């Protein structure tokens, strides 16, 4: 009996030791279908989540672009209802789970990385590590974790293309991608006729009517068949002349020493004697606007997309300007399509791909290491500005 008790006691001690060891193991963050994702990958995704949070904040306040550019902290801000650290953790955990889904899809589809792919991965890993190794090591990200993330990203691209590239599982055609360009981008030439200095100012009806009449005269000439580029140049010359006249009516101010301002135009022009002939722009005066653009104004962009058809010219008015807008076929700009085709493909099917990954994930067993989640705080994944260290 005593022997049995001793054996049971030993087994209990071993079991407790195993349990404590398992609970204390923070080398991994999540297991999906038994496949383990290291904590270093999670921490790396936290840093990516911080950048993503910055872009989310900048979408409503452009000042956050400067925060990111100059390394200013925005950890104390909120993205929607989440604090930035909460956003980072959720982002990192989601990406860690998706990591495994991508790996499994890559294998299921029988995809492979080419030798060129592997060389590019090596280059990217070494470049990222060599430039940031000290910071990565400080926050707990090893070079192997960097390699895993970059390799997984390359695999994700191949999985995406297997589904959504032309000839892939989805049945995408080249016309589908071109339709995205046509639906989301507009190609225009336009002239601006200002009638107010600020949207907050009371409208000067006389000034507004003069701008409207001027704009209408140019629109009439376009509709009569005159060349748009020639009219734009004419209008710009009028604007320049008006600005020059306005400058000339200002009084000459003396220098700080009381003397007249020196005319250095001759000296200034000396450096401009050598002229370099630039190649002619095949698409002069053209602007390409995305449907999400807010400049020159949201009213302008919305009107261009909803009220002006390709081949038409119309007047557009916002709070401070009247515009003469001529809309052209964006698909005729083959250079835009060729240079941005891959980006259009991703934009077209990004949500579909995310849904595909999430649907796969729902059918998998997922185990989250709460000990690792508690240990690896989002704040520690962000390099603090020098004055905060």
Language-model region placement:
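Sec/Tat-exported extracytoplasmic proteins
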Residues: 46-49, 53, 96, 100, ...
């Amino acid at each position: 009996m005593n022997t049995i008790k001793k054996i049971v006691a030993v087994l209990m001690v071993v079991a407790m030791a195993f349990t404590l060891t398992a609970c204390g193991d923070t080398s991994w963050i999540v297991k999906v279908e038994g496949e383990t994702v290291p904590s270093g990958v999670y921490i790396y995704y936290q840093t990516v989540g911080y950048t993503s949070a910055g872009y989310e904040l900048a979408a409503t306040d452009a000042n956050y672009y400067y925060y990111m550019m100059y390394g200013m902290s925005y950890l104390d801000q909120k993205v929607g209802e989440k604090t930035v650290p909460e956003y980072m953790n959720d982002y990192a955990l989601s990406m860690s789970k998706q990591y495994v889904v991508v790996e499994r899809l890559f294998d299921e589809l029988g995809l492979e990385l080419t030798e060129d792919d592997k060389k590019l991965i090596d280059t990217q890993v070494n470049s990222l590590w060599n430039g940031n190794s000290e910071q990565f090591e400080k926050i707990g990200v090893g070079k192997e974790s960097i390699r895993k993330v970059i390799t997984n990203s390359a695999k994700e691209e191949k999985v995406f293309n297997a589904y959504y590239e032309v000839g892939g599982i989805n049945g995408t055609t080249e016309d589908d991608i071109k339709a995205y360009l046509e639906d989301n981008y507009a190609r225009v030439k336009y002239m601006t006729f200002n009638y107010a200095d600020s949207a907050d100012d009371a409208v000067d009806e006389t000034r507004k009517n003069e701008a409207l009449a001027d704009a209408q005269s140019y629109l009439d000439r376009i509709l009569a068949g005159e060349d748009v580029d020639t009219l734009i140049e004419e209008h710009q010359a009028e604007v320049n002349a008006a600005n020059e006249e306005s400058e000339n009516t200002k009084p000459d101010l003396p220098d700080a020493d009381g003397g007249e301002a020196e005319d250095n135009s001759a000296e200034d022009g000396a450096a401009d004697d050598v002229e370099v002939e630039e190649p002619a722009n095949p698409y002069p005066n053209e602007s390409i606007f995305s449907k999400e653009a807010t400049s020159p104004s949201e009213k302008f962009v919305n009107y261009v997309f909803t009220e002006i058809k390709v081949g038409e010219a119309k007047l557009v008015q916002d709070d401070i300007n009247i515009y003469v807008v001529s809309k052209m076929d964006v698909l005729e700009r083959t250079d835009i399509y060729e240079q941005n085709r891959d980006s259009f493909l991703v934009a077209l099917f990004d949500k579909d791909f995310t849904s595909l990954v999430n649907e796969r994930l729902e059918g998998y067993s997922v185990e989250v290491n709460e000990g690792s989640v508690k240990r690896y705080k989002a704040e520690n994944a962000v390099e603090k500005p020098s004055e905060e260290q």
